[in-house]
Amino acid sequence: ELTNRAYAVAKIAGIETCWAHNRQHGTRYIAAMPTNLYGPGDNYDLENSHVLPALIRKLHEAKESGVLKISIWGTGLAWREFLYSDDLGEACLFLLNLPKRELDSFFNDRRPPLINVGTGMELQIRDLVLKVANVVGYEGEVSWDHSRPDGTPRKLLDNSLIANLGWKAAIDLDQGIQMAYTDFLSRYES
């Protein structure tokens, strides 16, 4: 997808750099690849933020100003996975503290030292909008602007590797949205 091209290239470059250093210098770098992140300190700008923080702000402002109908980009049918940022931090600590014998399985010449970090759960954007509206308290109508893009139809990481090692996200999406909204309010109102 064109809008994510530079980001994708940067991610691939990071993975390849880790792999090359491991082979050439005997390092033991792992590239932890997260799914869509959200949480404290997020960017809630309506023009250049990711979908979840943008929805928090858009629905909050609609509620506060009494707007009865809002329009959301796309069809709402795209599927996404979300991970609370604190969970990514915990996943990285988990990986850093893996026993040597489990860590050794990551390092070979046939596979890059990459591990996906996600929840393994996805939902459609239309369901995400309902969850955010519920947390924010927006009771108006939502319409879909089909002239705007949905983006990639589905973004779900295969997180089986980290799950099989025993790691699981601690913060579910409903709880995470509530915590993100609290963060938004503390920053928005100041």
Where are these regions (language model features)?
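Conserved sequence/active-site signature of Rossmann-fold short-chain dehydrogenase/reductase
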Residues: 37-39, 51-52, 88
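Active-site phosphate/pyrophosphate-handling residues
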Residues: 13-16, 50, 54, 71, ...
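Alpha-helical segments that scaffold the active site and NAD(P)H-binding pocket
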Residues: 19-24, 56-60, 97
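C-terminal substrate-binding subdomain of Rossmann-fold SDR/epimerase-dehydratase oxidoreductases
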Residues: 61-190
